[in-house]
Structure formats: C-alpha cells, structure tokens
Amino acid sequence: MKMVSSSRLRCLLVLLLSLTASISCSFAGQRDSKLRLLLHRYPLQGSKQDMTRSALAELLLSDLLQGENEALEEENFPLAEGGPEDAHADLERAASGGPLLAPRERKAGCKNFFWKTFTSC
C-alpha cells in the first residue's frame, strides 16, 4: 500500500515540476520576444550594441505608457477636459499660494545641520 502511494506522490511531484518548468519557459519566451521587438523597432548602431541604460529605460517606459494608454482607451475613460494650458494655469495657481508653513527662523550665523534637526548655536 505504501509503495502505491509513494509512486503516486512521485508521479504527482514530477507532473507538478514539469508544469512549473513549462510555465516559466513560456513567460521567459514572452519577455525575450518583447525585448527582440523593442530592439528591432529601434536598431542598435553598428554591432557594438552601445545602447545606454537611459535609452533602454526610455524605450521600456514608452512601451509601458503606450500599453496604459491603450488600456484607458479600451475602458473608455473620459480624457481630461481642457488642454495643457488649463493644467499649467492650475499648477501656477497652486504654486502662487506661497508656502503653507512659515520658514524656520534661525540665528544669522547658525547654518549647521545635523541629522534631521538644526543644531543650536
């Protein structure tokens, strides 16, 4: 009886491991195909592959933003009314209100800053 249950357990374990391996391989293939698509869309200069980190980050961010824009279009979210001028005017109004808290008063010669507090001079 124990032999039957241990063989079933082994079979189940092998099946589970093979399923996990196949899923991880399929996800790795999707990542590689997406990277190949990005590199094909923006070919590298020469054979040196001298694409900088910032350029690669820019490519990935633009692809991410494009995906988010497509998702928003699919969900039919209304776009913000008004143009960039309205947003700029809102930002200016918020900035012109002045600081909410008064700046910290300190003695004229006291400019020392230690950790998170000003030192007493």
Swiss-Prot record:
| Entry-linked InterPro entries | Somatostatin, Somatostatin/Cortistatin_C
Q: Which residues form the propeptide?
A: 25-105
| This protein's UniProt keywords | Cleavage on pair of basic residues, Disulfide bond, Hormone, Secreted, Signal
The molecular function terms of the Gene Ontology recorded here are: hormone activity
According to the UniProt record, where is the region Disordered? 76-99
What does UniProt give as the signal peptide span? 1-24
Instruction: Specify one Pfam family.
Output: Somatostatin
Domain of life, per UniProt, equals Eukaryota
- Primary location group: secreted
The family database entries (PANTHER family) matched by this protein are listed as: SOMATOSTATIN
* Family recorded in the similarity comment: Belongs to the somatostatin family.
What this protein is called in its record is Somatostatin-1
Species name for this entry?
Lophius americanus (American angler)
Q: Which gene encodes it?
A: sst1
